[in-house]
Amino acid sequence: MRQAVATMTDTQRYSILITDDDRGVREALGEIVEAKGFRPVLASHGEEAVEIVQHEPIHLAVLDMHMPKLTGLETLQLVRQINHILPAILITADATLELMRQAFHAHVFSVVPKPVNPHVVLTLVVRALGRTYGPVDEHPQNPAPGEPTP
């Protein structure tokens, strides 16, 4: 009899928190990561993102830099008080040297300029998850909890 070894990719999808005040960007990024087998969790602003991280397991955050109330970096600072290892990808329309410096000091995995390239985002998501949690099964058929494996 074959013994099963359970890993995160075998038993559940990674939850990707996508926070952007632009609904179109937020939903498009959600569709991109969902098509790859991840579970998107959408937030329209930083305070909502913090609340989500307080109440459910999140494995990676994709944060818009410029949002009302809290910037992406301010949001990251707050969510890291809850989950100190949470990897983050920052998206921005203005990737200045100063912003890059701030992101580096905040241990952001990567800064992605807008408009975002879906392939680049997916590659960075997989790399950030892999660096934090170990190798990631990139197959879009990752089963959700309770679903049979193919």
Where do the language-model regions lie?
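Short amphipathic alpha-helix used as the core "switch/output" element in two-component signaling
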Residues: 51, 73-85
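Active-site beta3 strand of CheY-like receiver
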Residues: 56-62
